[in-house]
């Protein structure tokens, strides 16, 4: 309880950590350190304490956030509720943000200012049909101010979570528990920003809830090794020699 309370104070979020269930943020098929894989525990920093840096801001030369990375790619990963609903939150990367400007839209991290629709090519690689191309947002008219988001696992072609921003050839996007298309993520729908990662440990919870199907064999192996090392460490310390200094030697 003391540890949980200290993490709550540190992050400003409760619960202060979430367990990742899906493969949507994986960078490699069998998982990798630094990326977000099924079974990882992710510390959630309150968005009141951390400003969200989008992918386009982190990849724009001259921007104050240029070069910033989180969990293996530029920009922050956010945890949000689809359309502000009560279904399981999504943990995906913030690609860009549409900010209202009079009758138009600004997109921080780009040259777009007071535009009626958003068209922009991101330096975001997508693998599709054996080739690689850049993610393109084409003539997107935001329903309201908010973030466009996407999972990092784009080996089957890039898909933006918000269907209204997906160009032809991309996936259909996400829907909420009522079947409504997910809209741009409002600030108040953001649960927090993904911070530190504890790999593999959350697999235990997924196993107990019957949701461990996405956890890779590599993660199970590393988890088993971690548990063995923790259990063996007290025994190992028993065999370490204890150094004594006699009073005569001290003189």
Which stretches of residues belong to each language-model region?
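Extended, hydrophilic extramembrane loops/domains of integral membrane proteins
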Residues: 139-209
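Juxtamembrane interface at the cytosolic side of transmembrane helices
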Residues: 216-251
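Feature for secretory/organellar precursors and membrane-associated catalytic proteins
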Residues: 4-123
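Long, low-complexity, polar/charged, intrinsically disordered or flexibly structured peripheral segments
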Residues: 109, 113-119, 123, 128-129, ...
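Intrinsically disordered, low-complexity acidic Ser/Thr-rich regulatory segments
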Residues: 67-70, 125-145, 176-179
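Short, surface-exposed polybasic-and-hydrophobic patches located at secondary-structure transitions
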Residues: 115, 207-219
């Amino acid at each position: 309880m003391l540890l949980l309370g200290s993490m709550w104070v540190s992050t400003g979020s409760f619960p202060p950590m979430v367990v990742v269930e899906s493969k949507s943020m994986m960078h490699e098929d069998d998982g990798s350190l630094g990326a977000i894989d099924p079974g990882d525990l992710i510390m959630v920093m309150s968005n009141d304490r951390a400003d969200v840096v989008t992918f386009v801001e982190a990849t724009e030369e001259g921007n104050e956030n240029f070069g910033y990375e989180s969990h293996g790619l530029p920009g922050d990963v956010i945890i949000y509720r689809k359309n502000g609903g009560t279904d399981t939150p999504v943990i995906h990367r913030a690609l860009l943000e549409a900010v209202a400007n009079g009758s138009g839209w600004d997109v921080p991290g780009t040259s777009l200012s007071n535009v009626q629709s958003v068209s922009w090519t991101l330096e975001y690689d997508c693998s599709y049909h054996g080739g690689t191309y850049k993610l393109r947002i084409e003539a997107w008219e935001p329903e309201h101010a908010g973030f466009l988001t996407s999972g990092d696992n784009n080996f089957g072609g890039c898909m933006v979570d918000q269907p209204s921003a997906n160009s032809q050839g991309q996936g259909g996007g996400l829907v909420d528990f009522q079947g409504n298309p997910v809209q741009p993520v409002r600030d108040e729908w953001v649960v927090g920003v993904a911070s530190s990662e504890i790999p593999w440990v959350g697999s235990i919870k997924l196993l107990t809830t019957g949701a461990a199907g996405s956890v890779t064999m590599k993660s199970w192996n590393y988890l088993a090794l971690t548990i063995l090392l923790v259990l063996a460490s007290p025994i190992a310390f028993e065999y370490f020699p204890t150094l004594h200094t006699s009073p005569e030697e001290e003189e």
